[in-house]
Amino acid sequence: MTSRPQIHVHDAKEANKQTATKLTLPAVFTAPIRTDIVHKVFTDLNKNRKQASGVKISTRGTAGMGHSAESWGTGRAVARIPRVGGSGTHRSGQAAFGNQCRKGRMFAPLKTYRRVHRRVNVNQKRHAVAAALAASALVPLVFARGHRISNVQELPYVFDDSVESYEKTKQAVAFLKRVGAYDDVLRVAETKALRAGQGKLRNRRYKLRRGPLVVYGNEKSTLTRALRNIPGVDVCNVNRLNLLQLAPGGHVGRFIIWTESAFKKLNEIFGTYSTTGVQKSGYQLQRPLLANADIARIINSNEVQSVVKVAGTTETHERKKNPLTNNNALFKLNPAAKIVKEQAKKAAEASKAKRQATLKANRKAAKTHKKGSQAWIAAFNKANEEAIAKARQEDADFIAQGQEIKEGDE
């Protein structure tokens, strides 16, 4: 909550100038910020803008049901879904009506008498509005919501009632530039983008972020005409504060610019912690659960520390460990066991090294034997080939000699 008891009223005609008027901070700005209530109320109220919609129903029947189709029944090795009758066209024999069918209806068609709107308790709405107003006075929350308020003098930002006489947009733009709020308008203008989906065909073609909210008090003010064409800037009468504008999206911390007359009416509308609101009959502001939110200061105070129980000593028990499975317990009982295990480990490592050396020598001998075997086989094959070639040559010579003898006899 804010801690400043008084708020300065700024001059709307000159930059960074305060008037002599100071206003007491309305009690609604010290209300507890219940984001859970704000989110719940916003979710329900946002549904009330919806229009009844559903599947088209005409004299020919509901959408997807305008066919003359009957099931073929069993015995044809096809599904028992209704099928279009007739012949001579592709449509004949095709399935109809079902949600899994082409040109069929949807599953559980939407009705126009669905429960779309939600009823919200009056006091719940009032608590949500009070929480949103309290959050708008905290600079960190306004910054966290994305508003650019680096050039803003203070929050809440209050100006004299000369603002309510503006009629032209150029007057409003000049005013926003003077008071340092035009940076937020430029941020909004940069976010303008084409809407995805069918909304772009339904007069919702573009979407953009929300900028400052200007709250005025005079019902006959022309300020609405001056601000209505500036992107992201909303205007609201203090008598009709709306949570949809105070916390768009259910997120508290909107940047609000007040006129003096509107700011003075807040205690009359919402009341204080001791009196009820006049316009909101019987409404009482929620009281914070903690008057001081500094938990560390509360805990360390003398009142709390004097009744805090002194920390006692806790009994500790040594955990029993099995020496057969836990080496540390075994070494504690038998220190010689550590030496035995180390000797066994060294013996195992020596045995492993010996095996590795033997294996390496055997592999080397096998490799040498393999090379010798391959050399002997190559020599044997070469000698065998030479013997075969020699035998073939002798056979050829013998045959040639026989042919010569035969020719000589003839």
Curated annotation (Swiss-Prot):
What keywords are annotated for this sequence in UniProt? Cytoplasm, Ribonucleoprotein, Ribosomal protein
Any idea which GO molecular function terms this record carries? structural constituent of ribosome
- Chief site of localization: cytoplasm
Where found, per UniProt?
A: Cytoplasm
Gene Ontology cellular component? cytoplasm; ribonucleoprotein complex; ribosome
Q: Which Pfam families match?
A: Ribos_L4_asso_C, Ribosomal_L4
Which BP terms does GO give this entry? translation
Among Gene3D superfamilies, the record links this protein to: 3.40.1370.10, 6.10.250.1240
Entry protein name: Large ribosomal subunit protein uL4
Protein's organism: Tetrahymena thermophila (strain SB210)
